[in-house]
Design a protein with these regions (language model features):
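Conserved beta-strand hairpin/beta-sheet module of binuclear metal-dependent hydrolase folds
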Residues: 3-50, 162-176
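Residues at the C-termini of beta-strands that transition into short coil/loop
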Residues: 7, 14-16, 87, 154, ...
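Short, acidic/turn-prone active-site loops that include or flank metal/cofactor-
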Residues: 87-92, 178
Length: 228
């Protein structure tokens, strides 16, 4: 999987449909480099770092989580630097830690999810780590000539959904916020979707980056969401 360039300061490792690995992005400021999400596993993080190094990019010293789901967070223990998440994300991850410590949780996930089974083939231990820094509503980071506005949003996908907006580049990272609730039989809450649409519309972005598909122009994403 090759690293893709969005702007001179933003690149990403694309979504891998074989394992359903989400995309991982890198925002390079003059002082700090921010990663979007911590990946499915340590192997996912290593593939990301290898791709960054191969193209001469610095490795991230900050990592922000878009939500708690395991394909976005179970690689956090292998990530460099300071990790950031919404407070509810850490609460959910703490629940995951308890599940992993109290029984055969990895075997359960392998039985339920073929992508997880492939990602963790030959492994029998989970390393679930909490983020070191949490926020409640919004957190603004000065990366050096680039700003990362990290904010919680209402979303049909997960109650801890977090977006990252880079105003200088007019790019909005949405994680899986536009998707249905995977852990509630794929339920799509129309009221929450409507509020998310309003949030996207109100954000001065040109491009929207979702975790499991290619980046989309804002107008195209809004048209799709409004058709659901």
């Amino acid at each position: 999987m090759e690293l893709q360039t969005l702007t001179p300061h933003i690149c990403y490792l694309p979504h891998d449909p074989q394992r359903d690995r989400p995309m991982l992005a890198c925002i390079q400021g003059q002082r700090h480099t921010l990663a979007i999400d911590a990946g499915y596993s340590a192997a996912h993080v290593q593939d990301f770092y290898t791709a960054l190094t191969r193209q001469g990019h610095p490795l991230p010293d900050l990592t922000v989580l878009t939500h708690w789901h395991y394909d976005h967070t179970f690689g956090l223990h292998a990530a460099q630097g300071l990790s950031i998440a919404h407070q509810r994300t850490n609460e959910f991850l703490r629940q995951q830690q308890r599940l992993a410590q109290s029984g055969p949780y990895m075997e359960q996930l392998k039985a339920e999810d073929p992508h997880f089974r492939l990602e963790y083939a030959g492994q029998d231990t989970l390393h679930i780590q909490l983020a070191e820094l949490t926020f409640t509503n919004m957190l603004t980071l000065d990366l050096g000539q680039l700003t990362a506005r990290i904010f919680h949003t209402v979303s049909p996908h997960s109650e801890d959904s977090t977006c990252i907006y880079i105003p200088e580049e007019k790019i909005l990272f949405l994680g899986d916020a536009t998707s249905e609730d995977f852990f509630n039989n794929g339920y799509m809450d129309r009221a929450k979707l409507a509020r998310l649409i309003d949030t996207i519309r109100a954000t001065d972005c040109a491009l929207c980056v979702l975790s499991h598909c290619e980046p989309l122009p804002k107008a195209d994403l809004l048209a799709y969401l409004e058709s659901l």
